[in-house]
Design a protein with these regions (language model features):
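Extended, histidine- and acidic-residue-enriched regions that form the cofactor-binding/catalytic faces
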Residues: 1-98, 102-195
Length: 195
C-alpha cells in the first residue's frame, strides 16, 4: 500500500529520533539510532503506520565528548523537529506524530516533548521511560553502554558489538536482549494501537 493510502487510512506517522553518540568501546556509534530504527520498522509492520526516515542526531550530555559523536543543541533539535512536523502536517495531512526515541538525556526529551503543531497531536515514546522491573540487574538502565543498550545490540545488531570489549561486570547477553526487545516492542505496540 502506498504511503498516501496508508496516511489516508490513518493519518499517523512514526518518527524515530536517535543520536550519534559513543556508548563505550564495545558498542557502535549511533547505538540509540539502531535501536529506534529497528523498533520503528517493527512497529510500522505491526500497525501499518508508515515511518519517516530516522533523525540520526539528537541532544547528548556534554560529558560524552568521545570521538565520532556529534550532537545538536536542544533548541536546534526542537526547531528541526517543529519544521519537519509542520512540513508533514501541511504537505501530507498527518494528524498524529509518534516520536520514538531511546535517549534518556533530559534536554533531548524536552526538545521532543515540547513540539508544537497547528492541529496534529504529538506523542513521545521513550524506550528508557519504560518500567523494566526486575528484567535488568543494573538498577540504572539509562546508563549509556550499560546492560540495556548492550543486551539490545547483542540481539538486534551483534555484528556491530565488539564482543571482546564488553565489560565483564555487565549482565548483558543476546538472550536477555531478545527478551528486553520483545518487552519493549509489546509495550510500545500497546501504546500505539490503543483506540
Amino acid at each position: 500500500m502506498a504511503v498516501r493510502d496508508r496516511l489516508r487510512a490513518r493519518p499517523t506517522l512514526l518518527v524515530p529520533v536517535g543520536t550519534t553518540e559513543q556508548h563505550g568501546p564495545h558498542l557502535p556509534l549511533g547505538c540509540d539510532s539502531l535501536i529506534v530504527e529497528r523498533l520503528a520498522d517493527d512497529l510500522s509492520a505491526a500497525s501499518g503506520i508508515p515511518r519517516a526516515p530516522a533523525i540520526e542526531y539528537g541532544v547528548q550530555p556534554p560529558t560524552h565528548p568521545l570521538p565520532g559523536g556529534a550532537a545538536l543543541r536542544r533548541k536546534t533539535l526542537h526547531r528541526v523537529m517543529n519544521e519537519l512536523i509542520e512540513s508533514w502536517e501541511e504537505g501530507a495531512g498527518v494528524r498524529e506524530f509518534v516520536i520514538l526515541t531511546a535517549q534518556a538525556n533530559d534536554a533531548h526529551l524536552e526538545a521532543l516533548s515540547t513540539i508544537r503543531t497547528a492541529e496534529a497531536s504529538v506523542v513521545l515514546l521513550d524506550v528508557f521511560g519504560l518500567d523494566f522491573g526486575d528484567r535488568l540487574v543494573t538498577p540504572r538502565p539509562k546508563v549509556a553502554g550499560g546492560e540495556l543498550d548492550t543486551s539490545l545490540l547483542l540481539h538486534i545488531a551483534p555484528a556491530f558489538v565488539a564482543h571482546d570489549l564488553v565489560p565483564l561486570e555487565l549482565a548483558a547477553s543476546s538472550t536477555k536482549g531478545e527478551a528486553l526487545y520483545r518487552f519493549i516492542l509489546e509495550r510500545l505496540k500497546e501504546r500505539l494501537l490503543r483506540p
